[in-house]
Amino acid sequence: GSIKTGMVTGKSHDYDADFIFATVQTLSKTENLERFPRDYFECCIYDEAHHTSADSYKKVMDYFTPKFTLGMTATPDKRDDHIEGRNIYEIFDHNIAYEIRLQKAMEEDLLCPFHYFGITDFEIIDDEMVNGKKLTTEQKLENFRFLTSDERVKYVMEQAQYYGYSGDRVKGLIFCSRIEEAQELSKKFNKHGWRTLALSGSDSEEVRRDAIERLVNDDINELDYILSVDIFSEGVDVPEINQVIMLRPTQSPIVFIQQLGRGLRKAEDKEYVVIVDFIGNYKNNFMIPIALSGDRSYNKDNVRKYVVSGNSLIPGASTIHFDEISKERIFNAV
């Protein structure tokens, strides 16, 4: 007979379908789970499986007893509860059905080539601490004024234009440290002729969808850039993005790759994606080459080698380039 597919979400309740696509938030409610016998599904597939350590996912996983469980994630080394020594692999009994890392995916031509430019950002007081002391409110305000100053706005715009993009017009993402900064920068960019919008987690699904439509489509009120803090780090798929600008310190190789990855989907009329990373004087800078190389050994010599000759180590048409001051900053962080 015919096979029926359906959804279980806040709005859809197709509980009797053969193949059900569900959001964890909805399915994990007890009254929804209990509509199903525990052995109802032969197979359960969990997307964004690095969240499987979260309570809502656990509740669903503990309830069902399928013959087969599969988890899919781009970041298996990341987990929600951040407890050292516990990991996602354990949850899936250390069975890895298939694994592909950035380097290999580039070699296999699964991703769009990227041109990465690590360039000098203006110096600011390091993000949270000065000489081991927390920043005063005054210093934080000064940082904020500085990060959103006309001078820096002009500098960012010049660099973005200089490094360019592939395609008829820019369809860009800009990652900022804080939502206030994203909102303020967006205002200033708009004053200078860019068409931008700042999005945050508090924006509705609809607002986000509308923004993406405007970014991607050429026949409606177009957007050049969406500014955000981390809303685009996972689960959002916009293959058309042809420029990614990083205006924030790198927190971890994982987050860095997730943000870079926003530009790596292939799309028509997009030959490559340009990544412009503004490298300030941050102590985490050494994570950038680690992320780009996929080298998890954290070996200092490898990190240095990668900064100096990244191009020869990255497969395909992609390129990596650090300006001199950025190289210095990374060497200092190592």
Stretches with model-predicted labels:
Residues 224-249, 255-258, 273-277:
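A short beta-strand element within the Helicase C-terminal
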Residues 10-43, 54-59:
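Conserved helix/coil segment N-terminal to the catalytic DExD/H
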Residues 1-7:
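Conserved helix-turn-beta segment of the N-terminal RecA-like "Helicase ATP-binding" lobe
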Residues 42, 51-116:
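Post-DEXD/H (motif II) to motif III coupling segment of the RecA-like Helicase ATP-binding lobe
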Residues 94-173:
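Conserved interdomain linker/interface between the two RecA-like ATPase lobes of SF2 helicase motors
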Residues 253-258, 262-292:
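Conserved segment of the helicase C-terminal RecA-like domain
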Residues 152-155, 162, 167, 287-334:
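Long, largely alpha-helical accessory region at the distal end of helicase-like NTP-driven motors
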Residues 7-16, 32, 183-185, 194-232:
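Conserved helicase ATPase core of P-loop NTP-dependent helicases/translocases
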